[in-house]
Curated annotation (Swiss-Prot):
It catalyses: L-seryl-[isocitrate dehydrogenase] + ATP = O-phospho-L-seryl-[isocitrate dehydrogenase] + ADP + H(+). GO terms for biological process: glucose metabolic process; glyoxylate cycle; tricarboxylic acid cycle. This is Isocitrate dehydrogenase kinase/phosphatase. One of its GO terms (cellular component) is cytoplasm. The gene is aceK. The keyword Thylakoid does not apply.
Length: 606
């Protein structure tokens, strides 16, 4: 294919991803019966039918994403990501009004819910996706009883599964060192990539050489045997695709067993498929699979085994976020909350105010041992708030949801928003408890021995950038400020502009990448007015968000002159209106930007 194609029209995609209507016969039977046992049985069937409708469409989307990748239909890849991320909620929202209208008393009938849950658990017993169906059931119930602010459990409960065995999703390929190009062909075949290729022989030779270089620190020997474990799945996202696995070297007597992770990144160019990069470093894989990017569509349906494999390849990244990065957000929500509760139970640590700077809009809190930061939005901003008008809690939550639903371009943290979640009062340090109840009256209530959160935001823990710059080695600090510029550019490519360009809104991860993590001040870049400096007469009276690029360095809180110079030298265009206006024009034209999610040094042809 020699040019970008449009395999799917908007109507084609809508038809292919449309959720079937609820089973109206079952709904009618549910509404008509007065027998509590019949009600419970039928309610379970109604919910399971809705879940099955949802699950069928969600499993269809990865194949559509693969087809769009092969057709080079980039707008379709973007639409599929948006469709998939909203599908779960759309399915719940399709059913809830019908149940509320037909059975308004259902929300208060605890006995029917208890019996119906037992019926549902019996119906899903033995199904692979039983835990997902149970999570769907909990979401449905929460939506129906939300007016009562009833807290729910995020435990997987009776639908829990035994630990996943990754052998179910990998193919093992035997090899003899040094790795030969023919082995790379087998690796690509195992993950389901078939071409047409631009230069498969050349790519295979370059990929084999890259793997050999990555193996060198493991002291390999010619003739030594290796096992390559490859996930039998393609992973598709926007303009790219990849396969993942690992290379194992066995105990050699003088050397213990050794292994390295493996990611092979593919592009589909005008003249065919290209192996673009090979990654064999866990931190680099973690960035490629980061929740700061759009989710991957994985063609293998065994999500537990895939998440477990990804966790083994990227152990610094919690298991819960591995589910989210392959599109299973609601299972990720369950796993993340369980991880937080387990961290507390094992460490006995209290949740306390997060290190760094006091938020003017959010209250952030964590445990020293935790991989996560929890947040609520204040009822009113603090006196240090920079802007004249505060849109309020619901508007801020909409911005956090906006970031969740877009391609975060590798530079914005994803966030999980829980509703009506209950946490034991004993989990909280006294000072934090007082602040939450005083500044979050619209969000937090105390019920006996627990706090109930109307909304609770959870993100991966970062080190605030200004704090990081005071403690990092000189080279790491310089790399961070340069990466900050990359972060701002990637945000712009995703049509996101942070009008509060303050370094305190950015953080550094465990793998030393910089991300935006506070979203109360984000706007769509296409709606921002980019202006030169000095302002024109009466320009300060302009409505909307006005941005003067020449002034951006002043707000970033990069105090060290050498670091400011490093930022300016690496990203001079960020201080020029032309750059921002050019990005706005591209976004308005509907262009899908290329976002690099691995180091340029890992590309096979640079």
């Amino acid at each position: 294919m020699t040019a970008d194609a449009h395999l799917f029209s908007a109507s084609d995609l809508e038809a292919a991803t449309r959720i079937a209507e609820p089973d109206f016969e079952l709904l009618d039977a549910l509404i008509r019966t007065d027998d509590p046992d019949d009600q419970a049985h039928t309610l379970a069937r109604v919910a399971l039918s809705a879940f099955d409708n949802y699950y069928a469409v969600s499993r269809r989307i990865p194949a559509l994403a693969k087809a769009a990748f092969y057709a080079r239909d980039w707008p379709a890849t973007v639409r599929l990501s948006k469709i998939r991320i909203g599908l779960y909620t759309a399915c719940i929202d399709q059913l809830v009004p019908l149940l509320k209208a037909g059975l308004p008393e259902l929300a208060n009938d605890e006995q029917v819910w208890v019996r119906a849950e037992a019926e549902l658990l019996a119906a899903i017993a033995g199904r692979y996706e039983a835990d997902f169906a149970f999570a769907f059931w909990q979401s449905l119930r929460r939506k129906l009883v939300s007016d009562e602010w009833r807290p729910v459990s995020y435990d997987t409960g009776p639908a829990a599964r035994p630990p996943a065995a990754i052998a179910a999703v990998v193919r093992t390929i035997a090899a003899t060192l040094p790795i030969q190009p023919e082995v790379i062909r087998n690796v690509l075949d195992a993950a389901g990539f078939t071409g047409p290729w631009r230069d498969l022989d050349g790519d295979a030779a370059l990929a084999a050489a890259a793997i050999e270089a990555a193996l060198e620190p493991l002291s390999p020997r010619a003739g030594e045997t290796a096992k390559i474990e490859i996930a039998e799945s393609g992973f598709f996202r926007n303009r790219g695709a990849c396969l993942v696995g690992r290379i194992r070297l066995r105990d050699r007597g003088d050397m213990p067993p050794r292994n390295i992770p493996l990611l092979v990144a593919l592009l589909n160019e005008d003249d065919g498929l290209v192996v673009d990069a090979v990654l064999c470093d866990s931190d680099e894989l973690q960035f490629a699979f980061s929740s700061t990017l759009a989710n991957y569509h994985a063609t293998n349906p065994r999500y537990h085994e895939l998440a477990r494999l990804l966790h083994e390849l990227m152990p610094k990244r919690p298991l819960g976020t591995q589910y989210s990065c392959i599109g299973f957000h609601h299972l990720g929500k369950v796993a993340v909350m369980n991880e937080i509760l387990t961290e507390h139970r094992r460490s006995k640590e209290k949740l306390a105010t997060a290190p760094g700077f006091k938020g003017t809009v959010a209250i952030a809190f964590t445990m020293p041992c935790s991989a996560y930061v929890l947040k609520i939005i204040r009822d009113h901003p603090t006196d240090d708030y920079k802007f004249d008008y505060f849109d309020g809690l619901d508007a801020v939550l909409r911005k956090y949801n906006l970031v969740h639903e877009i391609d975060r371009a590798g530079s914005m943290l994803d966030n999980i928003i829980y509703s009506n979640v209950k946490l034991a009062r004993t989990m909280f340090a006294p000072d934090l408890l007082d602040e939450l109840l005083e500044a979050g009256i619209g969000t937090v209530t105390l019920e006996r021995d627990a706090l109930v959160f109307r909304h609770l935001i959870v993100q991966i823990k970062l080190t605030p950038l200004p704090l990081y710059l005071t403690t990092a080695a000189a080279a790491d600090a310089r790399a961070a400020v340069i990466n900050l510029g990359d972060c701002i550019k990637n945000n712009a490519a995703a049509d996101i502009f942070n009008k509060d360009l303050d370094g305190r809104n950015y953080g550094v991860s465990r793998i030393r990448k910089v991300y935006l993590f506070d979203y109360d001040a984000v706007e769509q870049l296409t709606e921002v007015k980019v202006r030169s400096t000095p302002p024109m007469p009466r320009a300060e009276d302009e409505d909307g968000v006005v941005f003067r690029p020449a002034q951006m360095l002043e707000g970033l809180r990069i105090d060290d002159p050498g670091l400011r110079r490093a930022f300016r030298d690496a990203h001079p265009e960020l201080m020029q209106p032309d750059y921002w206006e050019g990005m706005q024009h591209a976004l308005r034209a509907g262009k899908v930007p290329k976002v690099m999610n691995y180091p340029t040094s890992r590309r096979l042809r640079r």
